[in-house]
Every structure is written in structure tokens, then in C-alpha cells.
Amino acid sequence: NKTQCFLIVEIGRKPGISVKELAEILRIDKSGVSRFVEDLVQKDYVERKPSLEDRRFVTLHLLPKGQERFEKIEHDMYYKFKEVFEQIPEHKREQVLEALKLYNEACMAVEGNAND
């Protein structure tokens, strides 16, 4: 499902991420993330490891099956973005990229304010 794909992508992009961090990124409560993670563990996509800094916490890592899925998702997202981007007239592409950059910066600023 989509949520599991988002989890796989975030774990793939940030190996060692915690359930708490995933919950914050995806804006899902920790118990919901834990349930989705448990399902991914059962399917051999993800493993939990004790944190090296604090053994009371666990970190999440992709197993080979999860890594393969992550790479496929990233590949598919790249080509989908490329396909969409190519529909934009060439002389407008730089504007679109600039607008996306500004949008991303605004999202990060709002996210930063939400964490204060």
C-alpha cells in the first residue's frame, strides 16, 4: 500500500531512522507507524536493530528485499517525474524548477515552525 511505500522510501533514504522520526515525517501517529513497520518486518522488507547510541531505542534498516523494492520505487518515481517534466515546454522548465525550489523551502520553513 502507499503508506508502506512511503515507509520503505524514508527508511531507504535514511537508514537507521527511528519510528518516531518516521511518524514525524509522514505525520502519522507512532502506533500507526509501528503497525506498518511490523507488517514490513513480517514481510522481510525491514529489520529493527538496537540503536548504537541508546539501546532502549530501535533503528530501522532495509533488508535485501526491502532495498530492492526501494530501488524500484525510486526508479519509478524518477521516470514518472521525468515524463511529467518533459510535458512542460522547454522554455518554461527553469521557471517550474525555481517554483518547486521555493515551494520546498516554504514547506521546510513551515515544518520548522511546527517543530518549535
What spans do the regions from the language model cover?
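Charged, amphipathic alpha-helical coiled-coil/dimerization segments
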Residues: 39-94
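Short amphipathic alpha-helical interaction/hinge segments
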Residues: 19, 74, 107-111
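Generic structural concept
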Residues: 4, 8, 63, 97-100, ...
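C-terminal regulatory/oligomerization modules of transcriptional regulators
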Residues: 91-116
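N-terminal helix-turn-helix DNA-binding core of bacterial DNA-binding proteins
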Residues: 1-32
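Short, locally clustered residues in the helix-turn-helix/winged-helix DNA-binding domain
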Residues: 9-13, 74, 101
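Residues in the recognition helix of alpha-helical DNA-binding motifs
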Residues: 36
